[in-house]
A protein has these predicted regions:
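Short, flexible loop segments at the rims of nucleotide/cofactor-binding pockets, characterized by
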Residues: 15-21, 89-93, 123
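Catalytic core of membrane glycerolipid acyltransferases/transacylases, capturing the structured
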Residues: 33-94
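A transmembrane-helix-recognition feature enriched in membrane-embedded lipid enzymes
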Residues: 1-28, 52, 60, 75-85
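Short amphipathic alpha-helix with an adjacent loop that forms part of the alpha/beta core around
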Residues: 28-33, 104
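Short acidic-hydrophobic, aromatic-tinged amphipathic segments that line or gate anion-handling sites
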Residues: 26-27, 88-91, 181
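Non-catalytic C-terminal accessory region of glycerolipid acyltransferases
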Residues: 4-5, 96-237
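Glycine-rich, highly charged phosphate/nucleotide-binding loops
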Residues: 23-27, 93-99
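Short, structurally constrained coil/turn elements
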Residues: 18-20, 34, 60, 108, ...
Length: 237
């Protein structure tokens, strides 16, 4: 895959991060393979998660091809950029084409990034996972890499006003150890294992997050924040 668009976009994104004064804590980069296909599965708390996780993976010299909703590809500005970076459009009404495109990318040795919850959660907790990520890894014969991102919701997320000031927010991204799945494995059992790994990573980045969660809109009630519960979040979809 010729990457003519990805490099200049990275330069622009890094310039934005510098302008915002973001303070990064990236962990587990050694778990991102230098070659070969893999599925990276991460939680979804903010609209910039894909760009931040992509930035965190750069030391491994890999470009992640993210699966993202079709509406982003339909936009006159973001659409050409997304296609130029070889991200994968997901049509929620008919996912067959996107599944095949992701499978093809994985078999070519690409890393595909997926938000297995399918949407951002207003609770900032990890919801139930959809099975597509596990099925992709099984079909392509590639490992799954769990990941967690935290802090991005403070910049831009659902139902909140974007905050692009120089706030110097801490941003945490952690990649867990890759694990393999085999064709014939119980999909639900693998999903449960993946979710558990993601929860452990998220708990770790939250525990080490330098800013207090107490009383903050961007933090779940479990950590003393004022975000709605996971159950309430499901009812608001």
């Amino acid at each position: 895959v010729a990457d003519l668009v990805y490099p200049p976009v990275i330069v622009a994104i890094k310039t934005l991060w510098k302008y915002l004064g973001l303070r990064f804590d990236f962990q587990g980069i050694e778990n991102v393979p230098k070659t070969g296909g893999a599925v990276i599965c991460m939680n979804h708390v903010g609209y910039l998660d894909f760009a931040l996780v992509g930035t965190a993976a750069l030391p491994a010299h890999r470009y992640i091809r993210f699966m993202a909703k079709r509406e982003i590809f339909d936009h006159k500005i973001s659409g050409p950029l997304m296609r130029g970076m070889h991200h994968i459009s997901v049509d929620r009404d008919s996912g067959t084409g996107s599944f095949v495109a992701a499978l093809r990318a994985l078999r070519k040795g690409e890393i595909v990034g997926i938000f297995p919850e399918g949407t951002t959660s207003l609770s900032f907790e990890i919801d139930e996972l959809k099975s597509g990520a596990v099925r992709l890894a099984m079909g392509a014969g590639v490992p799954i890499i769990p990941a967690a991102v935290w802090g991005s919701q403070r910049i831009m997320t659902k139902k909140q006003k974007p905050n692009f000031g120089r706030n110097k927010f801490p941003i945490s991204v952690s990649f867990g150890e890759p694990f393999t799945v085999a064709k014939g494995d119980d999909v639900e059992a693998v999903e449960a294992d993946l979710k558990n790994r993601m929860l452990k990573l998220l708990d770790s980045v939250q525990s080490n997050y330098p800013d207090s969660h107490t009383g903050q809109w961007w933090a779940p009630a479990r950590l003393g924040g004022t975000a709605i519960t996971l159950e309430e979040s499901r009812n608001q979809r």
